[in-house]
Design a protein with these regions (language model features):
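N-terminal domain-onset segments
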Residues: 1-56, 191-207, 218, 224, ...
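Long, hydrophobic/aromatic-enriched structural stretches that serve as scaffold segments
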Residues: 42, 49-80
Length: 240
């Protein structure tokens, strides 16, 4: 799917990340992909992002759209043209925007499900809840800005985690065609993340023991980005 370059502001982006048994994660992604591993574990999670002033690059800010969005994703690698590629596989997108819901998968990449979002935030704290209109997905997260990752994280430092996720700028989302994924690449003017000290985290998808049996998944850490100028560039579809 091709679309013009889209630009705007990432007002707030939370990456809530889980460490997952690699075999359990492989069962949840298309066979063409392999989990990208960190110390032998797959890394998956929810991207919770507030986008503002989203519009084609040639258009003024005043026409831009604002929305809250959630994407369930996993870091993956795959082979193409004899080379190893990396990105994220996005199994589901949810949005507060009716426009995103109607046009996603048709005019721009990725099907988007309608959802309601409740957000309370300050400079140092945030609490966010998301419930999909189809009642299939629920996400909660609450926390405050921290100085470092939890000591239990699979990443040895904030810099290591930042580099891992910066490499996942190319995302492939499910469509109504089970053999085709829509591609979209994020380009940021700067890449800067801060750790969050989490007091509550829940994802109905990642807490589903029919998908991830007990002992195969644990919450690892969360990161936040704020006030980032960015662009979205379409990428070639990927057939699985």
């Amino acid at each position: 799917m091709r679309l013009p370059v889209i630009q705007g502001v990432i007002r707030r982006r939370i990456l809530a990340n889980f460490r997952v048994d690699a075999q359990a994660m492989q069962r949840e992604i298309p066979a063409r992909f392999r989990p990208k591993l960190q110390n032998g574990l797959a890394i998956a999670g929810v991207c919770l992002i507030r986008l503002e002033h989203i519009r084609p690059r040639a258009m003024p800010k005043i026409v831009g759209l604002n929305s809250e969005n959630a994407a369930h994703r996993v870091a993956v690698i795959w082979d193409e043209g004899g080379e190893s590629c990396e990105g994220v596989f996005i199994s589901r997108r949810d949005t507060s925007s009716q426009i995103n819901h109607l046009l996603g998968g048709r005019v721009f990449p990725g099907e988007h499900h309608r959802a309601s979002f409740s957000v309370m935030e300050s400079d140092s704290e945030i609490s966010l809840k998301m419930n999909s209109d189809d009642a299939n997905v629920r996400v909660e997260i609450a926390g405050r800005i921290a100085s470092d990752l939890p000591s239990t994280s699979v990443f040895s430092s904030l810099a290591e985690a930042s580099s891992f996720f910066e490499g996942g700028s190319l995302g492939y989302s499910v469509t109504n065609d089970p053999d085709r994924l829509d591609g979209l690449k994020l380009q940021t003017r700067q890449w800067q993340v801060e750790p969050l000290e989490i007091t509550n985290v829940y994802s109905s998808y990642f807490c589903d023991e029919t998908r991830f049996p007990k002992g195969t998944i644990e919450f690892d850490h969360a990161l936040i980005m704020r006030n980032i100028q960015h662009e979205w560039h379409s990428a070639d579809d990927l057939y699985v």
